[in-house]
Structure formats: C-alpha cells, structure tokens
Amino acid sequence: MKPVYIVSWLFALAVSFVSCDDWLDKTPKDRLYPDVYFKTEDELRLFTNQFYNNLVPSAVDIYSESSDLIVKSDLMLEMSGQRIIPDEGNGWNFTALRDINFYLQYSHNCTEVNARNRYDGVARFFRAYFYFEKVKRYGDIPWYDKALDSDDPELYKARDSREFVMQKTLEDLDFAIANLPKTKNAYVLTRWTALALKSRVCLFEGTFRKYHGLEDYEKYLNACVSASETFMNESGYTLYKSGSTPYRDLFASINLQADEVIFGRDYEASLSVLHNVQNYENSTTMGRPGMNKKIVNSYLMADGSRFTDKAGYETMTFDQECQNRDPRLAQTIRTPGYTRIGSTKKEAPNLAYTMTGYHLIKYSMTANYDEYNKSCNDIPLFRTAEVYLNFAEAKAELGTLKQADINKSIKLLRDRVGMTNLDMELANSKPDPYLMSAATGYPNVKGANQGVILEIRRERTIELAMEGFRYYDIMRWKEGKLFENDLLGIYVPGPGTYDLDKDGTDDVCFYVGTKPAGNVPLYLEIGEQIRLSNGESGYIICH
C-alpha cells in the first residue's frame, strides 16, 4: 500500500514558538517545544514527512516543462526573448530550508541512534536537493546549516561560492547514502534515491564546469560515475519491460512501477490528490502542447540508422516520417495506428489539441481521465534509466567510455524497445551532422568522443522527454542558443484534406480563402488559423 503523508496536529504544535517569562513555572500544555520534542522515532518521522510535500516536484513541474522540446502557446520568457531583470526575487525562498535546519538542530533529542540517523538522512537529502535546485538557478548562494530567526544578521551575509555550496551538498548526500534504508520503496527515500540524486547532481555540476570553463569538472564527473556504478551494481533495480509497449506503460500506470522507479510522487483519487496531465494533452485550453519538429527528427530509425540521413526527410508528410522509427516515438506521441489505452479505435493527432501536430501521449491513460484535474497516475521522479544515462554521459565526457560501458547502460534502454545498440566506434567515426548543427544540435561538442557524446545526448532527450530535464540540460551544456531557433510542427504540402494516420478517414483540412464544404473534423485556414513556413505550404510555424 502506498503511504499517504499527513502531518499531524502534533507537528503543527511542535513548530510553534513562544517566549516564556521566568515567572512561568509550567510549560503550557497547548504547545510542544523543540527542547522536549523530537525524542521518538515517530516524532522524527512526523516532522520530516513535511519535506516530501514541500520539496518534491509536483506533476505539473515535470510534465509541462518549457524548453525547445515541447512547444506550447505560452512560451517561457527565455525563448520568447522577453526575459528582463526582475524588480524583485522569484524563487529566492528559504522557508523549506529553515524547517530542515530546525529539525537537524533538535533531532539529537532522540536517543535512538539508528532512527535519528535515518531521519537525519531524510533531512540532509532534502537539504542537498534544495541547494542543488538553487545552484542550478543562481550559481553562488548563501549556505545555511542552522535555523535563523528574522533578526539574525546572517540573513544578510554575502553569497557563498558555488564550490563551497556544492561540496556541502555532496557531504549531505554522502550522509544520506550511508544512513537511509536499503529496502526499496518508491514512495519514501532510500539509499538508492540518495545515490540517484548524487549521480544527477554530479553529472550536472561536472558538465556545467566543463562547458563553462570552470575547474574541477573531472572531480564531479568521477563522483557521478562512482555513484552510478554503486547504484547499478548493488541496488537490484532494472528497467520495466512488461507488455508490448513498456515505455508507454511505465508512465501510464496508476502506481509506480517498482522494477525501475526509485522514487516518485504519489497521487490518490480516493483522497482527491490529483493532477492534470491528461487534460493538458487532450484539450484546447491548456496551451495545446506538442513536440517540436527538430526533436521528432532526432529519433532514429528502428534499425538504428539516422532519420535525417534519409533523402527527402525534410518534406515527408506526417505518416511518412513516422514509419519504422524508434518505437519510443509512437509511445510518446500519436502516430498512425495509435489507440487509446482501453480502446481499439484508431485516433489521429488532433490539431485542436496540439499546435505542432505531434500530439503528446506520455502519461495518458484511459479516456475517462481527460477531464480537468482528473489524472491520478503517480509521477516518476527518479528512475533507473536516468542513472544509466548519467553514467554513460559522465564517462564519455571524461574520455573513459568503452563499448562495455555502453552495453550496460544505453544498450539496456534500447533493448527495452527492440532497438539496435549504440556502436561507439561508428558514432565517433561518423558524427551526426544534424546533431552538430547550431540550428538543430550541439555545436559546442568537440574532441575524439564528439560522436558518442552527441548520441548519448540524443538518447537522453528521447528517453527523458517530458520529465523535467531538458531546460537545465541545455544550460549545463552551454547551448542556450538553441532557444533562439524556430519552433516548428508537421510538414503540410499545401491546401487540402489529410488523412494523418492513413486509416481511410480524413482528419484535417487546410484551406485558403473560403472554407470548403465537407465533413472533415477540423478545418484550419492557412494564414489565419495556422501559419506555414512557405506561405501555403511548409512546416507549421508555432511562434
């Protein structure tokens, strides 16, 4: 059974502070004081439960990421060119950190050493997570390891260096790794969650330092490799491989798939703890999200060859470009032959719901969850696939990657969907021009491992799509110029009716001037309701 975290009234009382004059000879019984609280394992657990709600990302933070991967009607300011220096802070909030430090300040009241170390591990995991998110956004940041009062002069101290904060973050993670339980549980923190976070943190910091010309990048990349290998060798986690569409089913599941998911966010219909991913993907009012054309182009063919090496790929129609591709494409967007879970009816992409024509399906379950705020599938936050990708990328950036390393990481991801393995020698001998291009790829990648680094980035983008990674991946790779590139949708040869999924029924009509007669489900006037890159033909222009 999934645990539900409810902070009791005891906790609410425990964090209430009052001042008592000396003449009081009794502690008021309507309050609990830190000096007399935190004495039992239950009290430690109750207090630290709040960190799950306060610091774990929500579903919307994960599935609706703004980047060059998913295009929506409302662009993030970084991509629209409208970002300005704000008049006041946004995200500069330390309330959650104060709660963590307050707990750590008093947890020594508990004399049960094992219990105290476990819940100190929870607190220090979340402090590491808090600071990792802040460093990603701000760089240098003030480090606090004690709870401050509103008049404490340390509130106004200068920022600590990125180097100092990241070192402290790793110390917290190492403590969590040593003290959290080894028993798998996708809904509470374990040793394996802490190793996965260390893998993530160290990959980010190592590659950020490498591509931004900072020192010690090797230290962090080696730490990423070490944490990843420990996880891979000791945790017992593997990839979810059940059924004919395991990648799709991994995310379209009420409960987290414990084979692969290390930790995730719990949603529960019976408690009205819900999110909105399915309405986001299947309505006209949630930004009409769709995958960007260049990301679709980056999916390989099913035999491992490059789609962008095919003659005429630029002007292929939707049904043509979807043929014989990496199976993860058809498990992430609607492609010809798509059916909803629980239905046998074939459904085409709906351009009323997606502005690019690449209609998202990741996280979507049966159609009854399409209504607003009805989704209750749990959201994976840490999964084994990410650790594999972190491991391979860190070794490639260090120059220590071997084919054997690929075989125990990237190969496993491709095996799940029936794809051929990545050949390191071939990748480095023939780097992909599409991924080298400033318009569609990563021109900053150089050196002997250029080809395999590009292929690992391709794999990461595809495997972790809509999981909240893309924006900061681009930032750490120093490829922010990607946000200046065009955001495009499917190719439309010209006015006319189109059977997008080739089921024998027309799905959309693109027209110029007077709307034609007929019974097509959707009519779009070129130049008014939709813009194409060549006027009356071309790619859908989204912004």
Question: Each predicted region: which residue ranges?
Answer:
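Short coil/turn linking the two alpha-helices of tandem helical-hairpin repeats
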Residues: 135-142, 184, 204-213, 397-400
